[in-house]
Amino acid sequence: MRITATASLCLKSGMISVFITNLGKYNEGELVGEWLELPATSKEIEHCLMRIGIDGIHYEEYFLTDYESSIDGLSSYISEYSLLDELNELASRLAMLSPDEINLYQAAIEIGSSTSSIHDLIHLADNLDSFQQLAGVYNEYDLGYYWIEESGCYDLAQLGHLSHYFDYERYGRDVCLEQGGIFHSGGYVYHTGG
């Protein structure tokens, strides 16, 4: 099999990179493809397809033979059959997010609330407000302490010295299980609904 790659593997500033392969050439025993960094303009996509021989006349079909993302967990949703337009839409939405929102997005993917497709990931990028992040909360003790001491939900002053016997870690574990949240580099994240 002859291999022709017109660009090197390198995820630069894009959110998603895909190696697009000419299916017709592949079936003829030749691997002709190119890395494309997403998001990309329609012209960039068109030029990439032309460079690998997808001209709509001799060769019309392509598939994705490799892919990577700067977003943790995202690559597991991409397959060789993923739609390029859909991936580009996702990358465009992600490019508009701030670094803090990207961090929240990665945690939301890890939580896995109703994300089973690229379409779901696009929807998730548009609905990050349905997740709450508690910065500085990195373990069950911190979570229990936050909800008891800092959230204002409880008035421990009424308990007097009994409040010293409260098991923050155990309470935090229960809260985490109830909320289905996770601890990650930015703190604790949980789904609030929506």
Map each language-model feature to its residues.
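Short, glycine-biased loop/turn motifs at secondary-structure junctions and
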Residues: 21, 27-33, 52, 62, ...
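Structured domain cores in non-transmembrane regions
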Residues: 43-116
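Short, flexible beta-strand-to-coil junctions
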Residues: 21-27, 67-69, 110-111, 185-194
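Acidic, proline/glycine-rich low-complexity IDRs
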Residues: 4, 12-15, 141-194
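Residue-level signal for secondary-structure boundary elements
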Residues: 28, 57-60, 95, 99-102, ...
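Extracytoplasmic/secretory-pathway segments with low complexity and glycosylation-like composition
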Residues: 99, 105-152, 192-193
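N-terminal ordered "arm"
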Residues: 2-58
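Conserved aromatic
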Residues: 39-42, 138, 165
